[in-house]
Swiss-Prot record:
Record PTM Phosphoserine, positions in chain: S75
Pfam families assigned to the protein according to its UniProt record, in alphabetical order: Sec2p (PF06428)
A biological-process GO annotation: intracellular protein transport
Keyword Cell membrane carried by entry: no
Protein name (record): Rab guanine nucleotide exchange factor sec2
Annotated keywords: Coiled coil, Guanine-nucleotide releasing factor, Phosphoprotein, Protein transport, Transport
Gene behind this protein: sec2
Length: 527
C-alpha cells in the first residue's frame, strides 16, 4: 500500500478537485487509521496467537506429563494389586505351613505312641508265645509220660486178661466135675464167667481211655446217656447187678491159696452171688444203684439216697444230662483211681504155682514202683472239655459278658480277661471317687457320665493294666465269675458229698443270676 504522507497537493488545482482531494484525503486518513488499527489488531492477534501457541505447547507438555503419571499410576495400581494378592498368598502359605508343622508334630507323636505300643504288644506277644511254648512242651512231656503209662497199663491188663482166662478154664473144669452136685447153678456159672471176661475187659478199656486222655469226655457222656436210657417212667433206674469181681477173695487169700483152693472158693462165692441175684430181682432198691464202668466197678455206689423230684431234674433235658455227666466225672475219677491202684496191686501178686511170660513181665513191672505210681490218671481241670460248659458258654456266659462289644478293650486284652475269668483269676477292686480312673468311660459298655462316676476297676493279672467299670458291668462280671467258680468246685470234687438235685438247683441259681445281671436286675443294682 503506497505511503500518502509524502504526497503533496498542487496549489493550482480546481476547487472541485480540491473538494475531491479533500474527500480523498479524509478517506485516506480513515483508511490509514483503519490500517493502523488493523495492523495493531494483527499484531495483537499475532501476540495472542504466539501466546496461545506457547500456552498450547505448555498444555501439551502438561498433558504428556499427566498421561505419563496416569500410566505410571495405573502400573502402580496393578503392581499394588499384585502385591496384595501375593501378600494374601503368603499369609495362606504361612498358615498352611503352620498347620503342616502342627500336623507333622501330631503325626510324629502318634507314631511314637504307636511304636511304643507296638513294641509293648510285640513284647507281650513274644512273652505269651514263650509261655505257650513252654506249656506246650510240658504238655507234650506229660502226653509222652501218659503214653508210656498207657503202654504199661495195656501190658498189665493183658496179663489180667490172661489170668482171667485161666480162672475161667479152671471154673469151667470144676463146673463140669460138680455139675451133678449143683445142677441149678450151671446157668448162673456160665453167666458169671461171661460177665467176668466182658466186665474186666470193659473196665480195662475204660481205664486206658482215662489214662491216655483220648475222647474221655465223649466216652463219659455216652456212658451217662446210655445209662439214662434205661430209666423207667418214675425216674428210677432198674436194678443193676454187681460186677462178679466184687465177690472174689482178697489179694492175700488169693496169693496164699493154690488153683484148686481158688476154684472151691469161687464156687462158694457163686452160691452167694446167685442168692444176691434172687434177692435183687425180688426186691429192687428204691434208690438208683450206679455201677461204674471204670476199673472200680467192683463197688456198688448209691450216691443219692433220696430220688430227686421230676420238677427239679428232667432226664429228657439234654442240658441236665450234660450236667449229670459233668457232676459225676470227679467221682468216676476217684473210683477209677482207687480201682487202678487195686488192679495194680493185684497184677503185682501172681499165683505161685504158675509161671508164664505174662506173669514174668508183670513181676518185672512190679519191681519198678515209680511206673505204677506215675501211671495213675489225672483229672481234667479244663472246663472246655465238657459239653455242659460249652452249652453254658454259648447260652449264658458270652451273652452276659459281650466282650466283643467292649469298646475300651483291645483284642489281646479281651482275650486275657476272658482267660482270667475261665481260670477264676480276674481281680475286681472298688475305686475311690478321687481316682483318675473313675472319671474314664467304662471299658465294657462305654458308660461316660459324670454322675455317677465309675466305682470299680478290674484287671486280668495283679501286674496288668487296670480298666474302669460301672456297676452294671461289674454285676455281669461277678455273676459269670461266680458261675465259673461253681463249675471249678464241681471239677475239684467239692460238691461230691452233695446230692445231684442240690447241685442242679445251685447251677440253676447261678445261671439265673447271670440272666438277671444281663437284664440289669441283679442285687448289686438295686437302689
Amino acid at each position: 500500500m503506497p505511503d500518502v504522507s509524502n504526497v503533496r497537493v498542487k496549489p493550482n488545482q480546481h476547487p472541485y478537485e480540491k473538494e475531491v482531494n479533500g474527500k480523498l484525503m479524509s478517506q485516506e486518513e480513515i483508511l490509514s487509521q483503519k490500517l493502523v488499527a488493523a495492523i495493531e489488531r494483527q499484531a495483537a492477534l499475532d501476540d495472542k496467537y504466539a501466546t496461545e501457541v506457547h500456552r498450547n505447547e505448555a498444555l501439551s507438555e502438561r498433558i504428556r506429563e499427566l498421561e505419563a503419571k496416569l500410566s505410571a499410576k495405573k502400573s502402580f495400581d496393578e503392581e499394588l494389586v499384585k502385591f496384595h494378592n501375593l501378600e494374601e498368598k503368603l499369609q495362606l502359605t504361612e498358615t498352611k505351613c503352620r498347620n503342616a508343622e502342627s500336623e507333622k508334630s501330631r503325626v510324629e507323636n502318634e507314631l511314637e505312641d504307636l511304636t511304643s505300643s507296638l513294641f509293648e504288644e510285640a513284647n507281650r506277644m513274644v512273652a505269651n508265645a514263650r509261655k505257650e511254648t513252654v506249656a506246650s512242651e510240658k504238655r507234650v512231656n506229660q502226653l509222652k509220660k501218659q503214653l508210656v503209662d498207657a503202654e504199661t497199663l495195656l501190658s498189665s491188663t493183658q496179663h489180667q486178661l490172661t489170668e482171667l482166662k485161666d480162672v475161667m478154664h479152671s471154673m469151667s473144669d470144676s463146673h463140669e466135675q460138680n455139675n451133678a452136685l449143683h445142677p441149678p447153678l450151671s446157668r448162673t456159672t456160665s453167666f458169671v464167667a461171661d460177665n467176668v471176661s466182658v466186665g474186666s475187659f470193659a473196665s480195662s478199656t475204660s481205664g486206658l481211655d482215662i489214662l491216655t486222655g483220648t475222647s474221655a469226655r465223649e466216652s463219659l457222656d455216652a456212658k451217662e446217656i446210655s445209662s439214662d436210657k434205661h430209666l423207667n417212667i418214675s425216674g428210677e433206674r432198674p436194678a443193676t447187678f454187681p460186677n462178679p469181681t466184687f465177690i472174689e477173695g482178697s489179694d492175700e487169700r488169693r496169693s496164699a491159696s493154690s488153683l484148686g483152693h481158688r476154684t472151691n472158693n469161687n464156687q462158694n462165692q457163686l452160691i452167694r452171688f446167685s442168692t444176691q441175684i434172687r434177692s435183687s430181682s425180688t426186691s429192687p432198691p428204691r434208690s438208683p444203684l450206679i455201677i461204674s464202668d471204670s476199673p472200680s466197678s467192683s463197688i456198688i455206689h448209691n450216691p443219692h439216697p433220696t430220688h430227686p423230684s421230676a420238677s427239679a431234674m428232667n432226664y429228657m433235658n439234654p442240658c441236665f444230662l450234660e450236667f449229670h455227666a459233668f457232676f459225676n466225672y470227679p467221682m468216676k475219677f476217684a473210683r477209677s483211681r482207687s480201682a487202678y491202684s487195686t488192679s495194680a496191686n493185684y497184677s503185682n501178686t501172681p499165683p505161685r504155682n504158675t509161671v508164664t511170660p505174662s506173669t514174668a513181665r508183670s513181676s518185672t513191672l512190679s519191681q519198678n514202683p515209680s511206673s505204677s505210681s506215675n501211671s495213675i490218671p489225672l483229672i481234667s481241670r479244663n472246663l472246655r472239655d465238657f459239653s455242659f460248659f460249652k452249652r453254658c458258654l454259648e447260652e449264658d456266659i458270652e451273652p452276659t459278658l459281650r466282650l466283643d462289644h467292649a469298646s475300651g478293650l483291645s483284642w489281646l486284652t479281651r482275650r486275657s480277661v476272658f482267660t482270667a475269668i475261665l481260670e477264676s483269676s480276674l481281680i475286681i477292686n472298688p475305686l475311690h471317687s478321687t481316682s483318675l480312673l473313675s472319671s474314664q468311660p467304662c471299658s465294657l459298655c462305654g458308660f461316660n457320665r459324670t454322675q455317677p462316676l465309675r466305682q470299680f476297676e478290674f484287671r486280668s493279672r495283679p501286674d496288668s493294666t487296670s480298666h474302669a467299670s460301672c456297676t452294671y458291668c461289674v454285676a455281669r462280671l461277678r455273676s459269670v465269675c461266680n458261675f465259673v467258680a461253681f463249675l471249678h468246685q464241681i471239677c475239684k470234687g467239692v460238691w461230691s458229698s452233695c446230692s445231684l438235685e442240690k447241685a442242679w438247683d445251685e447251677c440253676l441259681k447261678k445261671r439265673e443270676a447271670m440272666f438277671l445281671s444281663r437284664v440289669g436286675l441283679a442285687k448289686e443294682l438295686e437302689g
